[in-house]
Amino acid sequence: FGLDTVVYNREECEKLGMGAFLAVAKGSSQEPKFIHMKYQVDNPKKKIAIIGKGITFDSGGLDIKPASSMLSMKDDMSAAACVLGVMSIIREFHPQVEVHGIIAACENMPGCSAYKPGDILTAKNGKTIEVDNTDAEGRLTLADALCYACELGVDEVIDLATLTGACMVALGTNAAGIMGNDDTLVKNLINTAERNGERYWELPLWDEYFDSLKSDIADMKNTGSRWGGASTAGVFLKKFVKDVKWAHIDIAGVAFLDK
């Protein structure tokens, strides 16, 4: 693509402190890869990072999915494919914007070394996470990716993920859910989607959603109440965003289509 690209292997991710991402990858024989692509220009008007969830197959881990729910899980890297698509064509448009494309790619498998419910993980920013369910793995990989992106000195971070079934329950397959910490960024993304024939619907990101994620032995759990699951996941991700405008787009409903 003509981009500056770095691909970190397992050992390099360990040195970077990506304990949450690497935990998800432990159950698979496939090597995890953390991918950072960069489109760079002189005197950029702003700097943006886009992150795509890159679970190349999601069995659910030890909290394994039913067989029928696993059939489409090769598509759990849909957001990573979106990021690759953007980065593959960005040079054709010559935007005066520095863009970082970030993907934490791995499988979530129930191998003999798999991470377990009850494990305590340490993310890149030092926050600890109690594993409540190994099938809530996407947010763990995104946690370290968000920390990494926030260290790049960017103005905005946008993450995309096939993150929650709860978003599909709320919005069906006709819209993606969006939330974030900056109203202007969120509204700009909603308006841009509408102009291009897509639908984003803003979901709340109230602090009260974090109540169900509280842990007695860690800074947070990776899952909480069954209610408000899309927003609960968003509040979890927010804990790994620092000093940057951020938006989270849950594309589960619009990615897993069979038509």
Model-derived features: positions:
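A generic structural signal for tightly packed, nonpolar segments enriched in small/aliphatic residues
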Residues: F1-K259
